[in-house]
From Swiss-Prot:
GO terms for biological process: cellular detoxification of fluoride. It catalyses: fluoride(in) = fluoride(out). One of its GO terms (cellular component) is plasma membrane. Keywords: Cell membrane, Ion channel, Ion transport, Membrane, Metal-binding, Sodium, Transmembrane, Transmembrane helix, Transport. The lineage of its organism: Archaea, Methanobacteriati, Methanobacteriota, Thermococci, Thermococcales. Na(+) binds at residues 75, 78. This is Fluoride-specific ion channel FluC. Disulfide bonds: none annotated. HAMAP family: FluC. It is a multi-pass membrane protein. The keyword Translocase does not apply. The chain crosses the membrane at residues 7-27, 39-59, 68-88, 101-121.
């Protein structure tokens, strides 16, 4: 990895993390359900699906932009560790149905949004 690529990943990661912090603060919890985390994970999944859809369908995305958006921004925006912690917290509080819904919603929403982003990139 060269310095330009490292800077692209670092800048994207910083912006993604700041955006996550902002968005998560808008809707952190709704009736014990961590909506903010679901939102940021869904948005990152959509962007990543769109980016890799562009690549798959033949659009030339420079490698430094792929690093900035994919690894950097989407990596900083999404948060598997917070999702895991929030699910664990729901289990610890004996909110078993909410914990299961959190897992199901995150898996379904993120995979669906990757797919939708991928398809929308086709043009």
């Amino acid at each position: 990895m060269n310095a330009k690529m490292a800077l692209a990943v670092a800048a994207g990661g910083a912006l993604g993390a700041l955006f996550r912090f902002y968005l998560s603060g808008l809707l952190p919890v709704y009736r014990d359900f961590p909506v903010g985390t679901l939102m940021v994970n869904g948005l990152a999944s959509f962007i990543l699906g769109y980016l890799y859809g562009l690549l798959f369908w033949g659009f030339d995305v420079p490698s430094d932009w792929r690093a900035f958006l994919g690894t950097g921004f989407c990596g900083g925006l999404s948060t598997f560790s917070t999702f895991s912690y929030e699910t664990f917290s729901l289990l610890r509080e004996r909110e078993y149905i909410m914990a299961g819904l959190n897992v199901a919603a995150n898996v379904f929403v993120t995979i669906s949004l990757v797919f939708i982003g991928f398809l929308l990139a086709r043009r």
